[in-house]
Design a protein with these regions (language model features):
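Short aromatic/basic micro-patch
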Residues: 3, 37-40, 82, 117
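Acidic, metal-binding active-site segment of PIN/NYN-like and related structure-specific nucleases
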Residues: 102-142
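Short, flexible helix/strand-to-coil boundary loops that buttress conserved ligand/catalytic motifs
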Residues: 13-16, 50, 95, 126-127, ...
């Protein structure tokens, strides 16, 4: 199962217009919804993104707000992981300089998830499982072939969330 870093979520949003990195889109289209999680930190960062976008361009801010409220939050209902005492305790055990990165790593470790991020260097020494989907191809999947056949709703779910025009 996977915890999505906020930049991954933002990049997947670009897939709606065909602008997301191909490897990321290929990977995400093969993952069942039940296997994906967000951190509450991502919601905080997305809200900051709405505020920033609204300051620059009200229409862009409104579009981002609509996507978060109408698609993202409902799709991840029950899959948004909190910053609780266990995550805080785990964060304290990690020797990472950036609090944000340490909280993502702690959340992934506490819940037994693989952190999907492009910034793998930020997590060196955290002993967290990492996955960088850039350059991913379906043929590159090592042991994931069988579950994709069993989870046929995964690709449709992600297409509806991120790809539909």
């Amino acid at each position: 199962m996977f915890l999505l870093d906020t930049p991954i979520v933002f990049e997947l949003r670009k897939a709606r217009a065909g602008g997301a990195e191909a490897g990321l889109t290929a990977w995400a289209s093969g993952v069942a919804r039940e296997r994906l999680f967000l951190s509450a930190i991502s919601l905080v960062e997305l809200e900051a993104g709405v505020a920033e976008a609204t300051r620059r361009d009200k229409a862009a801010g409104a579009a981002l707000r609509s996507w978060i409220d109408a698609q993202l939050v409902p799709a991840f209902e029950g899959h948004v992981l909190p910053l609780d005492a266990a995550v805080a305790r785990r964060r304290g055990q990690l020797a990472l300089a950036e609090t944000r990165d340490a909280l993502f790593a702690a959340t992934a470790l506490e819940h037994g998830l693989t952190l999907v991020t492009r910034n793998t260097a930020a997590y060196r020494g955290a002993r967290v499982k990492l996955f960088d989907p850039r350059g991913y191809t379906a043929d590159a999947a090592e042991d994931e072939g069988d579950w994709r056949d069993a989870a046929r709703t995964g690709p449709l779910w992600l297409k509806n969330l991120f790809v539909r025009a």
